[in-house]
Amino acid sequence: MITFEKISNIWLENVSFDLQYTYQAELKNATNHLKAYFGERVCDTIKGLDVDEYIRYLSQHKNPNTGKPYSKRIFSDIIDVGCRIFDYALENELIDCRNPFYKKKRKIPKNAPKKERTPIDDIQKDLILKVYNRTQIAALIMLYCGLRRGEIIPLEWADIDFINKQIAVTKSVELINSNNYIVKPHTKNGKDRYVSIPDNIIPYLKLEKYNSNGCQYIYSQKCGKIHTASSWKSSWKSYQTLLNYRYYSDLMKQQEKTPKPYNAPTGIPVLVEPFTAHQLRHTYCTMLYLAGVDLKTASKLMGHSDVKITLDIYTHLDEKYKRLNIDKFNNYIAKDTTNQIFDIQNQKVV
């Protein structure tokens, strides 16, 4: 009689030894969620009904890692890992029962929050363009060239072709432990690409190169070394704080008030929502869509492994902007019905 905890530990050890660190961490996180609930249970006693109750339990509690409700993505990951653990145990004849996680994804609560990809707004974009900071150049490249965080970290000045206005995206970084990256040839999907640099950020790049003092990397630590996970996180957080302060300071001056100092003990009100590196990349894709760039070209510029990924984004944007267009139409024709009275009982206009 073998417990779920023992089976899950065996499975995790055998499947994760040659996986990327980040994927290992994701599997471990999902496994820990499952062990917290099923850990001491004998695997043969866990039924589909128990999994249903577990899903219901999660829907009624918050994720201890985030303090927020479990998202559809987390539900899906947990159920998928549970299914894989039981499949592994059955395949190796460690247990003799049906897989209780089979087809349980259909049980994911419909009201579970779904993490939406959202582009940055015009205020955030304006701040990126006008507020100088060492992190600004990274934000500009991700926003206007669509590079991933893992592609901007190892990006070198040698990858920038100022004459042809192109960036050669030929490498990426992989996390090898909780803090350190290694540079790997090729990008996330194994495909190199060349991205055009829009005219509006050429001056920023030239100025940054002039001030780089011969540094190899376009966006590095202050010491010139490639970023670690912690140095990136710290720099990005400081950058977000600076953008918020600049907006707050400008607003106070417009109101003829004296802004608090940057490091005021009472803190600065959050007026500009922090954004992620991935949001900048998503904004780039949104701008490609709004500019009328065709699907195939957009997919190449984004470096997607499959055009279907780009299609999903374009389809979502299509639905969003079509809704906006019908709202404009409704507002336009509102004047046509201002004086109209509809008699519901007689089903006629009077």
Regions found by a protein language model. Give the residues of each.
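DNA breakage-rejoining catalytic core of tyrosine-based enzymes
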Residues: I2, D44, I95-C97, I108-K130, ...
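N-terminal core-binding DNA-recognition domain of tyrosine site-specific recombinases/integrases
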Residues: I2-E5, L12-Y88, K225-S231, P274-Q279
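Short, charged hinge/linker segments at domain and secondary-structure junctions
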Residues: I46-G48, D87-N111, E256-P261, D327
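Short, charged phosphate-coordinating catalytic segments
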Residues: D87-N99, M142-V173, K296
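C-terminal secondary-structure termini that scaffold catalytic or DNA-interacting sites
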Residues: N164, N177-Y194, D199-I201, C223, ...
